Amino acid sequence: MKATSNLLLLWGTSLLSPSSAFVIDNHHYQHPLVVDDSSSSSISPLKIFTSSGPSANKEDAPSYRKNLLSLHKSLIEIPSISRTEQEVGKFLLDYLRNNLGYIAKAQFLEGSSSDPFSQYDDDDHSQGRFNVLAWPSSHNLSSPRVLVTSHIDVVPPFIPYHISTSSESDEEITSDAFISGRGSVDAKASVAAQIVAVEELIRAKEVDPADLMLLFVVGEEISGDGMKTFSVVYNDAEKSKKEELPRFKAAIYGEPTENKLSCGHKGHTGGVLKATGIAGHSGYPWLFKSATEILVKALAKIIDADLGSSERYGNTTVNIGTIAGGVAANVIPKEASAKLAIRVAAGNQATGADIVRSAVDKILKEVDEEAFTMEWAGGYGPVECDCDVDGFETMVASYGTDVPNFEGDHVSYLYGPGSILVAHGDDEGLKVGDLETAVEGYKTLIKHALGA
């Protein structure tokens, strides 16, 4: 038994070792499927949401308001654009350890694949980027059944914190006060609400602290490398033949869902489409081949095509992010390229991306047998999440998350305050009441996931 306990503690320390794009045009396939509000289904990929779910009393401020707003403000005030998350990570380590008394560790991304059991250092953060792992209980770091997680990186540019009150005193702040700044929604609102929710449940003795673990990852807005690192290390430890180790029963992911419980989100694939032509004088286009011309023709067909759809996730949509080509207006271009981001609504998580790729490859051959090269950059199909929880309205998201980056047989829940429609914009923000509603929502989800 002693050997097993030591291994569990070793596993506890060993763990340390792609957004919604609404394309505005008049084509059927570039819009979500319209869902009849009169239907029995409560899932809608189209609606613009309003706050819902278990909510805090909006007349009387909850006892945790001051701590919630203070934590949220501190997180926003620290710039953490993807790949530069170290300072906000240091803040969280200090906050979780010194303010809450949790066990908190840094999980460095570098070197994780070669030696997952020796990649931590609690004090020296010069090793580079790191995830933040925290356990409310120090009794057994390997016993948690529910993972509560979100991301601490944000998109550029940095936007300072602001709250719409004449004073920041507790008396002046109401549930209608508006908080803005980069990350105020995506996803520092979720981070703050999750931490407060966990602490409130523990203080009320509604959960066993040993059942919970917190994970705040880097890199979600770019490649998902933070969650992918955690997944690799976690699953390497789980696959160890030395002893059976406990597995998470559920993972609760924090992302802006307007405090609705997401039933899943579209998948994603994409890459760079390159066209090769024959350069020549622009006065004689029939003698040469314009790379930009055939590229535009192919892109038009891709946008107009039915790349797959489903009742839950709507239509697969395409965003042409960048187009480049040619050297001068009077030269027929030899080369042209475009970067595509495709939100996949067909198939399942394992097959959806392949369905879309096959459809795109077929279109390219129809336009020109030899001119195109498509460099695909990974991908996955629609991601399902559990949304069968009493007290929540539901939705389906068109953006990507870290849900597919954490491999395992756990149940996934996707929920959080704020709207994705402002998440990456200059007007990113949400109301105090939305934050407080999220705290209550996370409390409900945690208790549901634990079967409490």
UniProtKB/Swiss-Prot annotation:
Active site: 220
Record flagged with keyword Glycoprotein: yes
Keyword Nucleus: no
Glycan attachment positions: 140, 315
GO annotation terms (biological process): proteolysis
Record-level GO cellular component terms: extracellular region
Coiled coil segments of this chain: none
Annotated binding of Zn(2+) 2, by residue: 186
UniProt signal peptide: 1-28
Positions that bind Zn(2+) 1: 186, 221
Cofactor info, note text: Binds 2 Zn(2+) ions per subunit.
Alphabetical list of Pfam families matching this protein: M20_dimer, Peptidase_M20
Classification via PROSITE patterns: ARGE_DAPE_CPG2_1, ARGE_DAPE_CPG2_2
CC cofactor: Zn(2+)
Gene Ontology molecular function terms on file: metal ion binding; peptidase activity
Main location: secreted
Subcellular location(s) per record: Secreted
Gene3D superfamilies given in the database record: 3.30.70.360, Zn peptidases
Family: Belongs to the peptidase M20A family.
Descriptive protein name: Peptidase M20 domain-containing protein SMAC_03666.2
